[in-house]
Design a protein with these regions (language model features):
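C-terminal regulatory/interaction module of P-loop NTP-utilizing enzymes
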Residues: 1-281
Length: 281
């Protein structure tokens, strides 16, 4: 069971090594990187490549670790008891399985995605340590222990919004997805847009990386935003020549709303354009 990428996902050699090492060690794969570098999609593509079921747990700021195990609805049970509902005799009717429970009892070895773990509070990773390490947990309401028949392949993503605890990090295999270089990005583009004109890609990538390198950019455009921009360029029939011969005093590229998503960055480019016009007089 090895991951070699898929036809829809360009995986670097380092990323393939990281995925396969985590699988071999039976450790969670902790993936960090800029937003839009394919961290979440990685879990989806691992599941596709290995023909494994995918279970997704998208973490929010209000998410608690126990929700990944199960949730007990005591309020509904109390109400049903007052109404004389026969279901109250079996407490299992009021227990909702969480994503870890689903992964532990899956018929086939699944890929479990715990997405954006750093959005939750600082104690969230520590609260999952034992369950992820031992692959079991206890349900207090029923007195049963849920054990994983086979360890799921766990992929955990983080955008570095918070530092993760050392004890949690020790139990993971870590990989940082670097922002793609020009050659890798060209391969990604060709996967999404087969047959796209090479000259358009070349000019678009040149402009894209120039924008990312502008000092003071608050939000640099991501891979997904580049793909959106290229799609618009093709729909609007913007040629490679238009990108190459653009007025250097304008600076802001055509259809820039797909790339520049922050008003401060728009103002930055407007100031740079003003300075270029002033200096060119």
């Amino acid at each position: 069971m090895r991951f070699e990428g898929t036809s829809a996902y360009v995986a670097t050699a380092d990323l393939k090594i990281a995925v396969n090492a985590a699988i071999a060690l039976e450790r969670p794969l902790l993936v960090k990187g800029e937003p839009g570098t394919g961290k979440t999609v990685l879990a989806i593509e691992i599941a596709k490549a290995l023909s494994a079921p995918l279970i997704e747990w998208h973490v929010k700021s209000t998410t608690k670790a126990l929700q990944g195990l199960y949730e007990y609805d005591a309020v509904t049970r109390l109400r049903d008891g007052q109404l004389g509902d026969a279901r109250v005799k079996d407490i299992r009717n009021y227990i909702k399985r969480g994503k870890l429970w689903e992964a532990f009892v899956a018929d086939e070895r699944p890929v479990l995605l715990i997405d954006e773990i750093d959005k939750a509070d600082i104690e969230f990773p520590n609260d999952l340590l034992q369950e992820l390490d031992r692959m079991e947990f206890f349900v207090y309401e029923t007195g049963e222990t849920i054990q994983a028949g086979r360890r799921p392949i766990v992929v955990i993503t983080s955008n570095n919004e918070k530092e993760l605890p050392d004890a949690f990090l020790r139990r993971c295999f870590f990989h940082y997805i670097r922002f793609p270089d020009s050659d890798t990005m060209r391969a990604i583009v060709e996967v999404h847009f087969p047959g796209i004109k090479h000259r358009l890609v070349a000019e678009a990538l040149k402009l894209f990386y120039e924008i990312r390198d502008v000092p003071g950019m608050k939000k640099k455009p991501s891979t997904s935003e580049l793909l959106d921009w290229l799609k618009l360029l093709m729909v609007e029939d913007v040629s490679a020549e238009t990108l190459r011969e653009r007025d250097p005093k304008r600076l802001i590229p055509p259809l820039h709303g797909a790339l520049i998503k922050n008003e401060q960055d728009v103002h930055l480019f407007e100031r740079l354009a003003f300075m270029a016009r002033r200096d060119g007089r």
